[in-house]
Design a protein with these regions (language model features):
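C-terminal domain-boundary segment and adjacent tail
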Residues: 28-32, 64-68, 72-74, 124-125, ...
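Metal-dependent polysaccharide deacetylase catalytic core of the NodB/CE4 family, i.e.
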Residues: 35-38, 58-154, 158-173, 196-207
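Aromatic- and glycine-enriched glycan-recognition loops and surfaces
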Residues: 44-51, 75-86, 284
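Aromatic/hydrophobic pocket-lining residues that form the small-molecule binding cavity
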Residues: 50, 80, 112, 116, ...
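A short, Lys/Arg-enriched amphipathic alpha-helix followed by its capping loop at the start of a domain
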Residues: 52-62, 90, 289-296
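Autoprocessing Asn-cyclization modules and mimics
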Residues: 207-277
Length: 313
């Protein structure tokens, strides 16, 4: 009986060795797909991917994805080639987000093909590796997905759903907008972890919105701002007065955290105003969400789209 067991074991061992040398792609020891995942994607190629988000992910040992509309590369408030290259060299994934950011569902198939093929070719011509796509406005249909299959491994849409590993629709990957209170985003993380699914969150430009008063002069778009006494700095985007709300300012956070009662000064215009309150700070919320994931679910993985596909497919 002992000899028979040894013979069976020897035959099995030989079988495995032959398979491993045959080039067979079948995974006889499959990866555990019941791993909860989170992916962060920043759409449009805003410069805040580099000047804000990169430092946040670096500090936590994580990476994210930047979805690039190629017509906007090297334009105001968007990433330049050097920044894109550094992001990818740092482990970020660069996704295509088409050439001109159209609603693909409004285009004939020939134009869809142009948008998807040329954007990939342009990015690759810059020396970047591009395997996956984010649909502008999350819009896609059967025809668009069939075109995407010619050029990409996967495509991300919206739908406000999680992605199950067992029935992954790789050309219609589900995602949630990050434009919600932190508590709601934490709820998405909780659900993904408990159900062992893949949560994809998409973002745009990282901004701070504040209520201001006592404005003197006019701020210049893109100028640097200082906040005293907090010592924070930022980049001015816009401000507008609302009848019921009062005046609101949008800015890109650069350093520090703006505080109520700060005096804001434009470094080029000399304009100034009072900071009454911070309505939302997307930089702070992003940091807190990443720390929530690492603290509460240390075995939950933050991955790029391509890495998530490696795990789930």
């Amino acid at each position: 009986m002992g000899n028979r067991k040894r013979l069976i074991f020897a035959v099995f061992t030989l079988f495995v060795i032959l398979l491993s040398g045959s080039g067979s792609s079948y995974n006889y020891f499959p990866m555990d797909k019941s791993i909860p995942l989170v992916t962060f994607i920043f759409d449009d190629g805003n410069d805040t991917d580099y000047i804000v988000a990169k430092d946040i992910f670096d500090a936590h040992g994580d990476v994210a994805c930047s979805a690039i509309t190629t017509d906007w590369i090297n334009t105001k408030n968007h990433l330049n080639v050097s920044q894109l290259t550094e992001l990818q060299n740092n482990g970020w994934e660069i996704l295509s987000h088409t050439v001109s950011h159209p609603n693909l569902k409004t285009l004939p198939e020939s134009q869809v093909e142009t948008e998807l093929a040329q954007s990939k070719a342009t990015l690759e011509g810059l020396g970047l590796t591009v395997k996956n796509l984010a649909y502008p406005y999350n819009k896609n249909n059967y025809t668009i997905r069939e075109v995407a299959k010619k050029y990409y491994r996967a495509g991300r849409s919206g739908h406000n759903m999680l992605n199950p590993p067992t029935i992954l629709d790789q050309y219609d990957l589900k995602a949630y907008s990050s434009n919600h209170p932190l508590s709601k985003l934490e709820g998405h993380v909780d659900k993904a972890y408990s159900e062992k699914k893949w949560l994809i969150l998409y973002h745009h430009r990282i901004e701070v919105k504040i209520k201001i008063s006592g404005k003197t002069g006019n701020f210049i778009p893109g100028e640097n701002l200082t906040f005293n006494p907090s010592g924070a700095t930022g980049k001015y985007i816009s401000d507008k007065n609302f009848v019921a709300y009062g005046s609101a300012m949008h800015l890109v956070p650069i350093s520090g955290t703006p505080q109520a009662n700060d005096i804001i000064t434009g470094q080029t215009s000399g304009a100034a105003c009072n900071l009454d309150r911070v309505d939302y700070n997307q930089e702070k919320a992003l940091i807190e969400l990443i720390e929530y994931i690492h603290t509460k679910y240390p075995d939950m993985r933050i991955v790029t789209i391509d890495k998530g596909l490696d795990i789930y497919l």
